[in-house]
A protein has these predicted regions:
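Short loop/turn segments immediately following beta-strands, especially the blade-tip
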Residues: 200-205, 250, 294-295, 332-340, ...
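A short beta-strand motif characteristic of beta-propeller blades
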Residues: 207-217, 254-261, 297-303, 343-351, ...
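Sec-dependent signal peptide cleavage junction
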Residues: 20-37
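Blade-loop segments of beta-propeller domains
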Residues: 209-271
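Solvent-exposed alpha-helical segments and adjacent loops
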Residues: 32-181
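Repeated scaffold domains used in trafficking and secretory/extracellular systems
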Residues: 218-228, 264-273, 306-313, 352-363, ...
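Conserved beta-strand positions in repeat-built beta-propeller and related beta-rich domains
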Residues: 186-192, 236-242, 279-284, 320-326, ...
Length: 464
């Protein structure tokens, strides 16, 4: 080939090489292009079948049950059963990358750092569901709130996709939060701080700072309180000191509407009877005294009852129930023309199976029943059978000696207090709460850092 032909061939090849490069410059047809490689978005789906549900080694029965319910619900709905365990680790694993990479659903407070991070800033009734790497973090400001977070996560599983042997869930955007609407209000006689306080058990603690409402009393040994209604206003009754009782408005004013310093010695219970009479039972004095709720607290009618400790008005039967040392009895009370008349219903008088009766409270949800506690047992009394029952729902967990105060909520959950000797030999600092869940009664210890409680009341103005 001649030199001229070789030059022409080289120029032709160069032109063929330049043309596609020019096209890549984006000016050939006016359409913008990119030389970056085209990639798919990252796959944020995970297989729940490979995950382990983890709860704290020392978590409450309530949280443990929430973790178990999560596993069972996933199994029932999708036929996939995740593993479940507590958070126990060997010492060297607490900060290891191996544990951080484990696919886990963390329930409540665990020893994983992701749990602490997930709960940051939560109020006592608030909850959150978040993700951190391969971790799904379910957090609550209290055990009750954690249970609400588990339920919210179960709702999010509606978007899960069942595959062969797996359950795919997209973690993208899995960020849920809310506030638990569950409330368990209690009234507490805090003898250490000389106050009646109202707190919400759902928050998990009943320290002074947790009080929704409180009133300080000038005397010691507040022995009883309850919420009632008088002349269209919600009121708080209290028995306290050596010979005192009062009724104040349940609002910010805390207005004293009635008071006496003439109860029998060591008042232990008080009750507002709808006819306008306030009854106060005193243990050492061995009397129940009946006062005009609109009066000056200086005149009364008295009925003897040895070691009288508890009172409860029964609107259905129209009687005031009372417990003394070894007896449950009832009284008809009328108030006509300024005169109080009290008559014991001897036909309702019943011997209590054990000694030293202490508390008497409504069994909300069943008007035939009442709680009765003694120095050695917790009973449910059936009015129709005239029997003290020990086989009531939850008895296996609730039954014990020396219960100073007890009550239940309309959903069946039960709260009680026993002495721990921290302040006085007869007071306790923490409450035992049993959350009703079907046939189960799931234990939660409700803590206080600064209380000394004698009685606890389900905060309900209804008599039964």
């Amino acid at each position: 080939m001649s030199l001229k032909k070789r030059i022409i061939a080289a120029l032709t090849a160069l032109a063929l090489l330049i043309l596609p490069l020019a096209a890549c410059g984006g000016k050939g047809n006016g359409t913008a292009t990119s030389d970056a490689p085209v990639t798919d978005l990252p796959d944020t789906r995970i297989d729940l079948a490979s995950y382990t549900i983890v709860r704290g080694e020392r978590s409450s029965a309530y949280v443990t049950n929430a973790a178990r319910n999560l596993r069972n619900e996933i199994k029932d709905r999708f036929g996939v059963e995740p593993a479940i365990s507590d958070d126990w680790l060997t010492e060297g694993d607490y900060t290891s990358e191996r544990v951080a990479a484990l696919p886990e659903i963390l329930i409540g407070s665990t020893n994983r750092p992701e749990s602490e991070k997930g709960a940051e800033g939560l109020g006592k009734n608030e909850w959150r569901v978040s993700t951190a790497g391969k971790k799904i973090v379910i957090s609550g400001g209290s055990d009750i709130a954690t249970g609400a977070a588990v339920n919210a996560f179960l709702g999010a599983l509606s978007g899960a996709e069942k595959t062969d042997g797996g359950l795919m869930l997209d973690l993208a955007g899995l960020a849920l939060s809310g506030t638990s609407e569950t409330r368990y209000l209690v009234g507490l006689t805090d003898q250490k701080n000389s106050t009646v306080r109202v707190c919400d058990l759902a928050g998990g603690s009943v320290s002074v700072a947790d009080s929704i409402w409180s009133r300080k009393y000038e005397y010691y040994n507040i022995a009883d309180t309850r919420l009632r209604e008088y002349n269209g206003r919600e009121v708080v009754l209290a028995a306290y000191g050596g010979n005192s009782a009062s009724m104040v408005s349940f609002d910010d004013k805390k207005e004293e509407l009635w008071r006496t310093d003439l109860t029998a010695s060591n008042p232990h219970a008080c009750e507002l009877i709808p006819c306008g009479v306030i009854a106060v039972a005193a243990s050492t004095g061995g009397e129940i005294r009946f006062f005009d709720a609109a009066g000056n607290g200086k005149t009364y009618v008295a009925e003897k009852l040895e070691d009288s400790h508890g009172l409860l008005w029964d609107p259905a039967a129209g009687v005031l129930w009372a417990v003394g040392r070894t007896v449950l009895t009832a009284y008809e009370v009328t108030f006509d023309g300024g005169k109080i008349t009290v008559t014991e219903r001897r036909d309702l008088r019943t011997a209590i199976p054990s000694d030293w009766a202490h508390d008497l409270q409504p069994y909300y949800g069943n008007t035939d029943r009442m709680w009765v506690t003694t120095g050695s047992a917790v009973y449910v009394y059936s009015k129709s059978q005239k029997k003290f029952l020990t086989d009531y729902p939850g008895a296996a967990k609730i039954q014990r000696k020396n219960v100073k105060g007890i009550g239940n909520f309309e959903d069946g959950s039960v709260v009680l207090i026993t002495p721990d000797g921290g302040f006085k030999t007869w007071t306790g600092r923490d409450l035992d709460f049993y959350a009703a869940d079907g046939g189960s009664y799931l234990y939660i210890s409700v803590k206080s850092t600064d209380g000394g409680f004698y009685k606890v009341r389900a905060w309900n103005k209804n008599y039964q």
